[in-house]
């Protein structure tokens, strides 16, 4: 019997090293042929990289992280070039090891106490009007990092009184009530938590997470803050059926969620879960119609849509594909 790997604190485990640490073996035993990307999945990069370099420089200066970089988002160039970014707080090492995600796994270090102030100043320097704050999972913290979210919201608003804040939170597994209490006095303008996939695929896609728990988190926040919109995102192309996605949409509506993102899953590397199917744009269009019929007030559905992709436009109800 092999000995468990002893992880060093602060060390990032990625790709094959990260996958080897997953207790539930989700990866196929036989090598599957990698699907070729269809034409609609090809990205046109911006001609100028000046704004991209400016944003990266501002983050490096204050030792901040963006999920855009840490998760290898395909929209990084477009979003950075438009002066938008999703900040990732509480470090860049996640205590979970989901096989779809490119964020590093490991034993994270203690959260930086000055991060909320640094984040607020960086946002002011960047002259942002809408900001998305997300984090890694921090199962090592008593409140899952919720107080840190609240501190960031407070500091950001003090320096940027006109700003709108969207938080994309983890599931706060085992500490939901404590987390919601911590965030109660400084809630965001939009509360986002992703279901990611259909419940049948949770063991494969989100080991350690629970579908109903995530739904309950969205519902409980909404009950405490009825005027704050709740939002969730789902990936497609992991082996789900269209019918399963429709059922997920119904579950979200039944738990008070009014904002939705649906996008195509892209494997960050050959070590991650493979893409089972590239969903055609027409199918995303069909699901958007269904979502609006179910009562979602905002539904961004398309191959390149991500939770925070043009989140400011999503919040305004503008078309995002």
From Swiss-Prot:
InterPro entries, per the entry: Aldolase_TIM, Elp3/MiaA/NifB-like_rSAM, LIAS_N, Lipoyl_synth, rSAM
Cofactors required: [4Fe-4S] cluster
Main location per the UniProt record: cytoplasm
Membrane-traversing stretches: none
Domain Radical SAM core: 80-297
Broad enzyme group: transferase
Pathway field: Protein modification; protein lipoylation via endogenous pathway; protein N(6)-(lipoyl)lysine from octanoyl-[acyl-carrier-protein]: step 2/2
Source organism (scientific name): Aliivibrio salmonicida (strain LFI1238)
Gene3D superfamilies assigned: Aldolase class I (3.20.20.70)
Annotated [4Fe-4S] cluster 1 binding sites: 68, 73, 79, 308
Catalytic activity as recorded in UniProt: [[Fe-S] cluster scaffold protein carrying a second [4Fe-4S](2+) cluster] + N(6)-octanoyl-L-lysyl-[protein] + 2 oxidized [2Fe-2S]-[ferredoxin] + 2 S-adenosyl-L-methionine + 4 H(+) = [[Fe-S] cluster scaffold protein] + N(6)-[(R)-dihydrolipoyl]-L-lysyl-[protein] + 4 Fe(3+) + 2 hydrogen sulfide + 2 5'-deoxyadenosine + 2 L-methionine + 2 reduced [2Fe-2S]-[ferredoxin]
Enzyme Commission code(s) on record: 2.8.1.8
Location(s) in or outside the cell: Cytoplasm
Keyword Chloroplast tagged: no
Chain coiled-coil ranges: none
Family: Belongs to the radical SAM superfamily. Lipoyl synthase family.
Listed name of the protein: Lipoyl synthase
